[in-house]
């Protein structure tokens, strides 16, 4: 069976699953230097993605469109070529506890000169399906809890087992937008307007809080206002909880909460306020998860999957793992909506077969494209050992290999690699990428060496947990040490078939150091480079390696 999942709104993507195997997933931001979070506003993008991967729309057995905003159903206004099309979709959240797999059928999916029928499952269902079906629990057939916390919903807990999944409870009445909304009122992204929502702010704030400290007096203010605005018996809190299905009113309530916070905390250092806000939400998450498990005991459910945009918060993921409530915690590399097309396709598989495992690779994104390299760049064959030598000479390299990684984080397929041995390298990488000085640079490290350098240093192939850099190594690899000593670590086996693992092995032979700086290769505010030509046109790194060829800028020396 061949299923095509489609995510039309922000983080637009097309994914095809065939007989239980992920064939590809094309996120629109990773095509043609598109903007981050690019939506699909023309169905021609679906036709193009299918064609690029050798699939004809007529050969798809079932199209599935991810659901979106709406209490009973959603609506999408798109184009097919130049023709306006209106498509019905499922709502954001299931309508009853056992309704995750309730679907809405539609017609009018116009792809080229043909019109197809489709199904649509709730948006939350795609998160549950993508998280569980890619997990080790699906492979072993074990049950799991699944936490979904997205921008405009409360954190929702589900129980997945066999052929069914059911809603357990909402942990507490705070929408995921709260994290980024705090940045409208405190810190470097403070705004005078409530508009101009930036999906990238939450991650930047996560970096900024390393400059601050948690203070219980600030946390106490957030706790008091939380009761007044969200959780208590006040008229304000009751109205908020009653209108949660209205995304505009729920966001306005979050803004009101932080506006009230700003009135009481205006004299505090913004970095301390944001650090305390982060901690307040983290403690609330951990405490309410523990309460949920105490009041809703589920035999055998000692596994946890995490999905939704808040699943990109590595500190919260680690805090949940460190509670001891779970034997194992799984976060896919695409917990946010970048995984929703995959999840939409999985919904149909689940409806037919139950929560079966998906055969997948994180390197299932778009293939590298051909393109004309700018005049003056010198191209020559280049071995992996030669790449390692360039890196050992303290020169960064844009490293492009095979198919792109899935999700928002560069994992060695569309990366800028660099030696981590000087503190200046972090500043240099932030400068060439037009990033703030406090932003961290991630390490990519050989898995077997990671416990020597990081704590816990456990396998983390997708950069989804927090690690502390051990003291002897903080001076050896300062470029990957964040301001609070932490690191957003990616580990990779030295036996991996991916070329970036070979680079690390060769670099270790030359230097004794088993890690490198790893940051995404892209224009500022755009998706990953689709080609070597794009990286050369960008031109802010003098060496570009692409599947065996090294491109050198005219001013560069090897």
Swiss-Prot record:
GO terms for MF: transferase activity
First-level EC class: transferase
Keywords: Nodulation, Plasmid, Transferase
InterPro entries referenced in this protein's UniProt entry, alphabetically: Carbam_trans_C (IPR031730), Carbam_trans_C_sf (IPR038152), Carbtransf_dom (IPR003696), NodU/CmcH_Carbamoyltrnsfr (IPR051338), Nodul_NodU (IPR048155)
Record-listed E.C. numbers: 2.1.3.-
Disulfide cross-links: none
Domain of life: Bacteria
GO biological process terms held by the UniProt record: biosynthetic process
Family per record: Belongs to the NodU/CmcH family.
UniProt function note: Involved in 6-O-carbamoylation of Nod-factors.
NCBIfam families: nodul_NodU (NF041651)
Protein name: Nodulation protein U
Organism of derivation: Sinorhizobium fredii (strain NBRC 101917 / NGR234)
Gene that this sequence comes from: nodU
